[in-house]
């Protein structure tokens, strides 16, 4: 109980990551119910009576501003109208900035949902807080029956031997750049450093946000693949922090070099994730690293015809991909796990994955790319490139206290780049704090 209360208190102070990006509001629960023709199961397999279930997610099915919300409503409506059991799913939308804290509070109060959307970076937080339960049996059967699903049971299995969720979309951090400014995207650190000549008094060239705002996420989505490109990693197999390695020092000093050379402007000190994306969209930044979940927002810019994306530059070639994704799990207080699973598996059909692709969410099924409708999409080749680049990395399930760690790493990098601190000393301080907590 002490551990749960501790996690609850911590979660109230934490901003969680959004999803394929973030939703713009935090509305009350919305019930989805409409008429469609798809079916999620065979009536002969329905010995149970239907039940009412709740589904928490950061998207709002009542909103038409976000294409992902529109797809969510369509999928839930179809399930409610056609599932073999007569189940009804009610969506409870929670804004991404309050998602973990509110969900943990609801569960602690005995009002946990039947179905939980959990971002991969925060999955361990849900496991430790007890908001979700193992779904190993369902997951292994599903993966065995669906060879086109991109995730393996082995990679989704946690330290306790259980699988707690299945990713329903993927996103990978890529380099976005202006084709009217650069002939091609840089592939190596040296090539990236050389783009300093494109920076002007009116526009920054390349930008990685170094602010510790939003938990330092802007930095970590580049720091991590660069660290792996240099031969290091954040943690060892036992969960010990090892980013203060020679590779980690090399990355921090390279970031400092980018600022000193003028490749990045000093204003990145105060730029968080959204600041960098907005600057790129407005034309005051010429290149950046950002997740593919931001594609719809990025391409809403008047300059979008000059935007392109590519793998992130690494030490001697493309850096290993930083992969994350939204996942679905069975709530720890689900009234009937079998029924919760019946809804969850409906998310992963080819038809529903095609719908998510139309909303610029990367599919978790390779066979979706074989569909003629998908191949006819204007950005088919780009999205296929994202999917192929994602195979160079793997989804990482970070520890429950990862949010505080990434904030401290961002602060350490700031001290080196802008205050002249020693990179090894700065990283050692954060690693020692983490390993001795």
Predicted regions and their residues:
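Conserved N-terminal structural module of periplasmic/extracytoplasmic solute-binding proteins
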Residues: 6, 20-128, 316, 339, ...
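Hinge/lid segment of periplasmic solute-binding proteins
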Residues: 34, 41-42, 46, 119-174, ...
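Conserved C-terminal helix/tail region of periplasmic/extracytoplasmic solute-binding proteins
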Residues: 46, 260, 388-437
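Extracytoplasmic/periplasmic substrate-recognition and gating elements
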Residues: 51, 78-88, 261, 300-362, ...
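Extracytoplasmic "Venus flytrap"/periplasmic binding protein-like
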Residues: 82-149, 180, 185-187, 279, ...
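Periplasmic solute-binding protein
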Residues: 124-131, 136, 150-190, 211-237, ...
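Glycine-centered hinge/linker elements that transmit conformational signals in sensory
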Residues: 195-202, 239-268
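Long, aromatic- and glycine/proline-rich binding clefts that accommodate carbohydrate-like moieties
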Residues: 310, 358-408, 415
